[in-house]
C-alpha cells in the first residue's frame, strides 16, 4: 500500500503486506500514520486526502482528522433509476453532447458504512444518462452510470470530481516504482526482508524524484527543452545518474571527472554547488 504527496509524486508512506491479507486490514492505521507523517512536514493548513473505493470503510474516516478528504464510494443498494430521479431534482445539469445528460450535486443523507450512529457525510454525485451512444446509435433503454464520492469539501460537486480525477497520476507513480526501479518482484522469500528493501526503495524513489525537480528548476541550463512539471524516474536515471564519470582520489579529495562532451554537466555542476 502506498501514499503519495504533492503533485510531483513523492512517496509519503509505503507498506508491504502478505497476499492473503484483506485490503482493509491495517488500512486505518496506515492512513493515521500517513496523516501523522504529513503533519511533520509542516506544510501549514489542511491537506486533501484522496482515496479509492477500496478504502471507503467507515473506520477510515476516524483517521482523517481535520483534513479534507475525497473517498470514492461504490453505490450498493441504490437503484440507478431512483438516483437519476433524485439527481434531476437536486443536481445541476452539465453541458454535454446530444443524447448524454450529466447531473452533478450533493446528497446529504448517507452514513459512512450505513452506520446510523455516525453523522451523515456529504456525498458528491455524478449521474450520467445516455440515450444515444458515442457512435450515434439511439438506445432503446437509457444507459445509466452513477458515480459517488464521500467528501467534506464545500466547493461545487464538479470541482470535487475534478480534484478526485487529479489523483490519476498515482497509478503512473506506481508504474515507475515497478518498472523504472525494477521492484515489481522483490528478491527475498522473507516478508520482513522485503519490507526493508521496499523502505530502501522509497528512499531512492524520493531522492530521484527530488533530483528530477532540481533539474527542472534549471531548465535554462539544460541541453534540451524542458516544459513539463515532472520527470519520470527513468528519465532522471538516463540523463543524470547514468552519466559516465571517472572517480579520482587525489590529495585527500574525491573528484568526479566528466567528459568534455557531457551534455548535462552544467546542470549537474549547478545542483552540486547548491548542496555544497
What are these regions (language model features)?
Residues 1-42:
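Electropositive, glycine- and tryptophan-enriched low-complexity nucleic-acid-binding patches
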Residues 9, 46-56, 69, 149, ...:
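Short, conserved catalytic/metal-binding motifs centered on acidic residues
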Residues 17-19, 54-56, 74-76:
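Active-site beta-loop-alpha junctions enriched in small/polar residues
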Residues 55-56, 66, 83-84:
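Contiguous mid-protein beta-loop-alpha structural module that forms a pocket-lining wall or clamp
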Residues 58-74:
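A short alpha/beta connector and helix-capping loop motif
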Residues 70-179, 270-276:
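An anionic, glycine-rich sequence signature occurring as long contiguous blocks
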Residues 153, 157-196, 200, 204-213:
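Short amphipathic alpha-helical "interface-anchor" segments enriched in bulky aromatics
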Residues 208-276:
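A short, flexible helix-boundary coil/loop motif
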Amino acid at each position: 500500500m502506498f501514499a503519495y504527496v504533492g503533485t510531483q509524486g513523492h512517496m509519503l508512506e509505503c507498506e508491504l503486506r502478505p497476499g492473503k491479507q484483506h485490503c482493509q486490514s491495517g488500512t486505518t492505521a496506515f492512513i493515521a500514520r500517513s496523516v501523522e507523517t504529513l503533519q511533520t512536514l509542516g506544510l501549514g493548513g489542511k491537506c486533501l486526502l484522496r482515496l479509492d473505493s477500496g478504502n471507503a470503510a467507515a473506520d477510515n474516516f476516524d483517521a482523517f482528522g481535520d483534513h479534507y478528504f475525497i473517498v470514492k464510494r461504490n453505490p450498493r443498494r441504490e437503484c440507478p433509476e431512483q438516483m437519476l430521479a433524485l439527481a434531476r431534482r437536486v443536481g445541476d445539469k452539465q453541458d454535454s453532447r446530444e443524447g448524454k445528460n450529466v447531473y452533478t450535486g450533493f446528497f446529504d443523507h448517507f452514513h459512512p458504512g450505513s452506520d446510523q450512529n455516525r453523522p451523515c457525510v456529504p456525498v458528491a454525485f455524478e449521474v450520467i444518462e445516455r440515450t444515444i451512444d458515442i457512435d450515434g446509435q439511439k438506445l432503446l433503454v437509457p444507459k445509466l452510470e452513477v458515480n459517488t464520492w464521500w467528501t467534506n469539501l464545500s466547493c461545487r460537486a464538479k470541482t470535487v470530481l475534478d480534484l478526485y480525477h487529479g489523483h490519476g497520476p498515482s497509478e503512473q507513480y506506481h508504474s515507475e516504482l515497478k518498472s523504472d526501479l525494477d521492484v515489481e518482484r522483490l528478491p527475498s522469500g522473507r516478508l520482513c526482508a522485503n519490507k526493508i528493501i521496499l523502505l530502501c526503495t522509497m528512499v531512492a524513489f524520493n531522492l530521484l524524484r527530488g533530483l528530477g525537480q532540481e533539474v527542472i528548476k534549471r531548465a535554462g541550463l539544460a541541453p534540451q527543452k524542458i516544459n513539463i512539471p515532472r520527470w519520470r524516474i527513468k528519465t532522471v536515471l538516463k540523463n543524470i545518474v547514468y552519466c559516465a564519470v571517472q572517480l579520482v582520489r587525489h590529495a585527500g579529495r574525491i573528484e568526479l571527472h566528466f567528459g568534455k562532451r557531457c551534455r548535462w554537466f552544467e546542470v549537474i555542476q549547478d545542483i552540486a554547488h547548491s548542496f555544497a
